[in-house]
UniProtKB/Swiss-Prot annotation:
Belongs to the universal ribosomal protein uS9 family. Keywords: Ribonucleoprotein, Ribosomal protein. Gene3D superfamilies: 3.30.230.10. GO terms for cellular component: cytosolic small ribosomal subunit. Coiled coil: none annotated. This is Small ribosomal subunit protein uS9. It comes from the Bacteria. It comes from Parvibaculum lavamentivorans (strain DS-1 / DSM 13023 / NCIMB 13966). InterPro entries: Ribosomal_Su5_D2-typ_SF, Ribosomal_uS9, Ribosomal_uS9_bac/plastid, Ribosomal_uS9_CS, Ribsml_uS5_D2-typ_fold_subgr. Pfam families: Ribosomal_S9.
Length: 162
């Protein structure tokens, strides 16, 4: 190791190490199973989704049923497809998902979260785009609990002055 005698030597040494660290950075690697699929889990409200993606024609199966059958409302299908649209990867991956818990809206959000994470495992270069759009962040909002002495979580019982 070389001797550092002045502040300039120290700055030069630090700049040299940071530049070499960037050059020697290990590129992100795909995380695939033995079938060539990327697996990820997604959560939203009380719903938990397990998602597998593999290269294909854009087929989506949820709990063994087609996307149009499981999510009849177009809004829920749109929520589910958002990560693919943002990443410009529509019709390029076959998606298989199993989802339990919650309602349809929470399930659609959980699958969206799972698809986003699986896409980053398949194509690590998409991480920046998906993170910027907020698809990789777990939406932590859940239903507020009911409190005793109240009708609901915040709603009080009707008050009578007399």
């Amino acid at each position: 190791m070389s001797e550092t005698t002045s502040l300039e030597d120290l700055k030069g040494a630090m700049e040299g190490t940071s530049a070499s660290a960037d050059a020697n950075a290990v590129p992100a690697v795909q995380k695939l199973d033995k079938f060539g699929r990327a697996y990820a889990t997604g959560k939203r409200k009380n719903a938990v989704a397990r998602v597998w993606i593999k290269p294909g024609s854009g087929r989506v199966k949820i709990n063994g049923r087609d996307l149009e059958v499981y999510f009849a409302r177009p809004v829920l299908r749109m929520i589910l497809n958002q990560p693919l649209v943002v990443a410009a990867r529509e019709k390029q991956y076959d998606i298989t998902a199993t989802v339990v818990g919650g309602g349809l809206s929470g399930q659609a959000g959980a699958i969206r979260h799972g698809i986003s994470r699986a896409l980053t495992y398949f194509e690590p270069s998409l991480r920046g785009v998906l993170k910027k759009e907020g698809f990789l962040t777990r939406d932590s909002r859940v239903v507020e609990r009911k409190k005793y002495g109240k009708a609901k979580a915040r709603r009080s019982f009707q008050f009578s002055k007399r």
